Each structure stands twice: as C-alpha cells, then as structure tokens.
Amino acid sequence: MKKIITTTLILLAASFLPAQEGTVPADLLIDIRWQDGDTRTIFSHPVTQVYGQREDSKLYQNVGEVTNVGYYSLNQVLENIGSSWKRQKIDNETVQTTVDSLRKVAAGGYVYLYIERFLENRANLQYFFIIIRDKNDKTLYSKYFQYQAPNVTATRSTWWNYIVTEIPIELEYPFYVYVNDKQSQHLSDFKFRIDAVELKDVEVISVDEVME
C-alpha cells in the first residue's frame, strides 16, 4: 500500500513539473552545450558546470555527446499546485494531505538528467547515477538509475535518455549534482552547482499559502 501511495504522489507531482519523464524533455535541456564555468538559468535556478566539458576539439560543436541537469524545487511544485487547486477549489484537507506527503517523498525537489551518447549502449540509464553533495562537498544522497532504453535523436547521430528523479531529503543552496557514468574511466564525470532561484528565494510554503 505504501508503495502505491508513493507512486501516486510521484505521478501527481509530475503533472505539475515543467517536463515529465517519458516525454520529450524541455528544449533548454537538449540545446545546452557547456564549457566549464558556464552558468545557465534552468527552471529559474542558476546552474553552473564545474567540470565535465568536452575535449577541446569538440568544444564548440553543436552535435555530439551531451550531459545536462536541471532542478525544480518542491516549493516550485507547491506553487503550481496552489495555483491550479485554487482554481479548482480543492478542499483544505486534500491539500494538507498532499503537501505533507509530497514533503516526505520529495523534500529536496526534483533533479532532471538529460544525456546524449554516440552509442546506444552508452545511453542506457542503468549505467548512470547521481550524487548530491552540499556546499562543502559532503555527500547527502545518491541515486542509481535502473534500466531505461534510450531513444535515437531526430538526426540519428546520437541516442538520448532522460529522467526526472525526486530527492527525498531537504537541500540547502548551493548544492552540487554529480553525474557519473559507470562505463567511463573517471572517478567522477560531471559536476554541476545549483543555486537558489533567481530574483527571489522562495520560502517554505505553508498549506495556507498554497490555498491563498
């Protein structure tokens, strides 16, 4: 029963995310090509690639392998839920139960991962995992992905894969997302820094605020 409830909550939250697992990801996740030190705004959060840029000969190419991450906080999800449910006049008890449950399942929000690889077997998610670390590089959480077959891109030059995963622990800004490939020769392959939402730091949203 607990697993069914958790799955239902994940699906509910997914309906309020900007792009959902299993769909074509948002263009900004597909189109970004990084150099180390670059900062891009993704879902309102400044995201900086600390390391992981392609070798110099391929640095400025628009085709090739891609590794991109994005982050959507639980507060952003709750804001979306509040706006939607206010229009639908959902009762407070339902809102309370949903908000409390989501905070247990995804207290730290949602991390997006989009990859492209030249070889099909290199783009299967079973070979990837992420590590979340705080500003002092202390490990907070890790997630090893299960088998998920990739899709071929429109140009048929690469294979892509994509997942949105919930983070069950609270996070403080800034924090780091490490993306690691089990098939690579590196101890760690990519490191991204996630900073607070631009323009304002959204405070923790109460049930009353969701319903305002």
Feature locations, PLM:
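Conserved functional micro-motifs across diverse proteins
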Residues: 20-173, 180-212
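Sec-dependent N-terminal signal peptides
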Residues: 4-17
